[in-house]
Amino acid sequence: MNSLFASTARGLEELLKTELEKLGAVGCQVVQGGVHFQGDTRLIYQSLMWSRLASRIILPMGECKVYSDLDLYLGVQAINWTEIFNLGATFAVHFSGLNDTIRNSQYGAMKVKDAIVDAFTRKNLPRPNVDRESPDLRINVWLNKETASIALDLSGDGLHLRGYRDRTGLAPIKETLAAAIVMRSGWQPGTPLLDPMCGSGTLLIEAAMWATDRAPGLHRGHWGFSGWAQHDETIWQEVKAEAQTRARKGLAEYSSHFYGSDSDARVIERARSNARRAGIGELITFEVKDVAQLSNPLPKGPYGTVISNPPYGERLDSEPALIALHSLLGRTMKNQFGGWNLSLFSASPDLLGSLQLRADKQFKAKNGPLDCVQKNYHIAETTADSKPATVAEDYANRLRKNLKKLEKWARQEGIECYRLYDADLPEYNVAVDRYGDWAVIQEYAPPKTVDAQKARQRLFDIIAATLSVLGIPPNKLVLKTRERQKGKNQYQKMSEKGEFLEVSEYNARLWVNLTDYLDTGLFLDHRIARRMLGEMSKGKDFLNLFSYTGSASVHAGLGGARSTTTVDMSRTYLEWAERNLRLNGLSGRAHRLIQADCLGWLREANEQFDLIFIDPPTFSNSKRMEESFDVQRDHVALMKDLKRLLRKGGTIMFSNNKRGFRMDLEGLAELGLTAQEITQKTLSPDFARNRQIHNCWLIRAA
């Protein structure tokens, strides 16, 4: 009997143990990442040929203590390699692990190689050659602290390499993991199996091979025992012949069918080729179609199983599309696949929540470095009185109500951008803004006391409901997470897409960017203030400080201002402001753009203006500004500087976003200024619920 080890992906160890025991293995012991077992030579070949779950079959050769590189050399050389190697066999060494002595895996591999080669040289035998690409023997050495374990890898290449797949494309899951997913799905061979996002077809091919009793190793051309001196070719050929006979019989007797679809025609063609190479191409129907076109191929029965490894996203901007995909899949399953089972394997359990289905079972497994989950569902049969499930029903109803009211108002006003929802319901803590036929969801970061998993699932429900109510495609929904911004983080860049959208606001055309920054380039709550500035600007010299993207300057210019001066510290936003001005035919010397620290520029400027708009940050401590600024503390000093630039009879429109801001009327009076609060006049219906979003004042000489 041989002591052996079968490695596998973490989470599949118990499944592998059961498989090995069915093959005849004895003494099976599960450890993390694999199973120790015992078996004769025939079992070695059977496990290599038939294991669908093992990554490699390893034959341990010995262990040694390693306190120096000499210990490693002598420990490896103590093994009788001349009884392991066939004459002329090539080899490669795979070394993993480090300790205080062996600090480099390449150095460790070199010492092992030297020890093996010298073992032959000392016996005056031809030294074996190293072949790193396709060796006859693979020697594995694992160093754990002071112990080195030496073994022969009888697999050669990993056992997931079945020999049927085109290796040119990326594979989201290995064949061994795909086989485990099929086994855990609850699918019964002989019943239909469908994968609506099949990619290169791995799940379906592994299922078809399992169902037709086709050994996973049948198509492999190279093994790790080809240079092994103890290899028994007779037994191997018997094992191989048995596998071929069973495969022919299984294919001839199998009567059910498999269905695969994907939106990418190229991967579907690859899937067809893979299935043909696997010898089961006639059993699988592959089609080019996306999940939106998914339908039950057997509406009159029998019931089957839908299985898939749907895509998941690592970037925030990919989530709306993925949530929509999962939500659509869930609805399609309930509408068309009553009585069927569903099994999905995902690296994003939160996305599976968008199915709006309750899982009967779930399993955990590793897909490379990713922690994944497989969830199995049973789809209830639909009845005449079945009601369609709703997602985030309270939120959806409120959004629908707001849309009905605000859409009509916006159309009458001639605006395309407005706030549709602003945390109206505390449990749905987001803002939803419309920009033409686009929508932006801003999630207000939940407090630390809220369970992160629940908050994420709630957000996914919000996205699914928003897409449904607004009837927009997922690629026109942008998701952002908004946290309390401080100082220089206020305009932090989020992306590099550089995609601008042209929108209308009354008689102005403006550019917005929905993806690259936390804000879009247009503060929606200041919409009425901008219109008022346009109405006040005719024939006047207009100054716009802390101008952002210059939208107020556009309205002033369109309102007939004699000149506009737009000042901001950011080159990016000034260039954006210039684009906005040009879009509205406003260019030339009458429309100046100045890049400067606004407070510093204000103190040094000696020009005169009839109308000044200033919307400073609540607080700023930018490195590029000479000093910190606090709007509550410093607004009187700010007005003193502004008064110096204000012509007789001129007006300052002053706005800020500080909640609880208190205007120092006495301080203004000492400067000879009066202030009239116009906050309520500047709040439009879409911000009626949030009356503290900004405060706004008209300031004039007394």
From Swiss-Prot:
Main location as per UniProt: cytoplasm
THUMP domain residues: 43-154
Localization of this protein: Cytoplasm
Keyword rRNA processing assigned: yes
Keyword flag rRNA processing: yes
Keywords for the protein's UniProt record, in alphabetical order: Cytoplasm, Methyltransferase, RNA-binding, rRNA processing, S-adenosyl-L-methionine, Transferase
GO cellular component: cytoplasm
Reactions performed catalytically: guanosine(2445) in 23S rRNA + S-adenosyl-L-methionine = N(2)-methylguanosine(2445) in 23S rRNA + S-adenosyl-L-homocysteine + H(+); guanosine(2069) in 23S rRNA + S-adenosyl-L-methionine = N(2)-methylguanosine(2069) in 23S rRNA + S-adenosyl-L-homocysteine + H(+)
Example of a GO MF term: RNA binding
Enzyme Commission number(s): 2.1.1.173, 2.1.1.264
SMART domains: THUMP
InterPro entries documented for this protein: 23SrRNA_methyltr_KL, DNA_methylase_N6_adenine_CS, RlmKL-like_Mtase, RlmKL-like_Mtase_CS, RlmL_1st, SAM-dep_methyl-trfase, SAM-dependent_MTases_sf, THUMP_dom
Domain of life assignment: Bacteria
Protein family according to the UniProt entry: Belongs to the methyltransferase superfamily. RlmKL family.
Function: Specifically methylates the guanine in position 2445 (m2G2445) and the guanine in position 2069 (m7G2069) of 23S rRNA.
Name of the protein in its database record: Ribosomal RNA large subunit methyltransferase K/L
Gene source species: Salmonella choleraesuis (strain SC-B67)
Gene that encodes it: rlmL
